């Protein structure tokens, strides 16, 4: 399915969010592993497994044609030889949609965990789990602070 090679997990993550912004389902699915054991959970959604369910869910999300911008912040990355886990905050804005006061709509931030597996064809996403961020966004991490999730 995928002819693209992502030399690092960060390259795969960048390609995932770029495809989301462009509304390019094929480019987004090229980031995912071809394994049937992939998992995706959208905010408030059920657990989806396998290529068919994951692809169908993203096709529905991208079908309305809204152009979104995603700013990733608060990234914590943990990497090993064969696996990488990225915890991020996804900050969305929707272009062209206007609220009642004429300002861009800005949905609440989303916290997401993306898991990447190193394969013979480069790094591939195997898990994307996203949930609404509770309350206020946490402040940016300072240099030298611990990189511990819990």
Question: Language model features by range: what are they?
Answer:
Residues 1-33, 37-150:
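A beta-strand edge to alpha-helix "cap/lid" segment located at domain peripheries
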């Amino acid at each position: 399915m995928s002819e693209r090679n992502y030399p690092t997990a960060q390259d795969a993550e960048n390609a995932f969010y770029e495809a989301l912004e462009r509304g390019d389902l094929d480019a987004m699915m090229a980031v995912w592993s071809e394994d049937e054991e992939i998992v995706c959970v959208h905010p408030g959604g059920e657990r989806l497994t396998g290529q068919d369910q994951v692809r169908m869910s993203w096709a529905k999300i991208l079908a309305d044609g809204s152009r979104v911008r995603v700013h990733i912040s608060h990234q914590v990355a943990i990497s090993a030889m064969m696996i990488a886990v990225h915890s991020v905050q996804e900050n969305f804005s929707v272009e062209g949609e206007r609220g009642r006061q004429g300002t861009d709509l800005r949905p609440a931030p989303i916290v997401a965990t993306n898991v990447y597996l190193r394969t013979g064809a480069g790094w591939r996403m195997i898990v994307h789990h996203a949930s609404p961020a509770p309350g206020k966004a946490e402040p940016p991490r300072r240099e030298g602070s611990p990189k511990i999730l819990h």
